[in-house]
Amino acid sequence: MANPAHISAVRTLYKKILVLHRFLPIDLRALGDQYVKDEFRRHKTSSDEEAKHFMVEWQNYKDTLQTQVLEAMGNKKLVFGADLSEDKLKHFQDEQIGQLYELMLESTKPNRQFDIQEEGTPK
């Protein structure tokens, strides 16, 4: 599935996700950006079927995040994330469950490991 149209669609989706991450709190943005980069890199050599599923799921993520960003801009209230249904979790591989668990732990830490500040913010 390495045709030019597919490659263009992957790049466009990747860039849109990174743009949406700019609206996340800085520590979650750093975590999300790194995860997206790793996942897209990891799936460069996937089969056609895996690539199709990968694109559908990341498109769903982009759509959900875009909706949440637009709602947050209107309400000035930052609420990001979504619950996964049991049905979706049943389709995950063990490695994916482990990754999801690690992401959940990292993103819900009260004192997150990232000590990142917005540009122009004094230390």
Swiss-Prot record:
Task: Kindly list the places in or outside the cell where this protein is found, as annotated in its UniProt entry.
Answer: Mitochondrion matrix
Q: Which superkingdom does the taxonomy of this entry point to?
A: Eukaryota
- Where exactly is the transit peptide annotated in this entry? 1-31
Q: Name one GO biological process term.
A: succinate metabolic process
Listed A to Z, the keywords are: Chaperone, Mitochondrion, Transit peptide
Q: Where are the transmembrane segments?
A: none
One short Pfam family name for this protein?
Answer: Complex1_LYR_2
Function text: Plays an essential role in the assembly of succinate dehydrogenase (SDH), an enzyme complex (also referred to as respiratory complex II) that is a component of both the tricarboxylic acid (TCA) cycle and the mitochondrial electron transport chain, and which couples the oxidation of succinate to fumarate with the reduction of ubiquinone (coenzyme Q) to ubiquinol. Promotes maturation of the iron-sulfur protein subunit sdhb of the SDH catalytic dimer, protecting it from the deleterious effects of oxidants. May act together with SDHAF1.
Query: What's the protein called, per UniProt?
Result: Succinate dehydrogenase assembly factor 3, mitochondrial
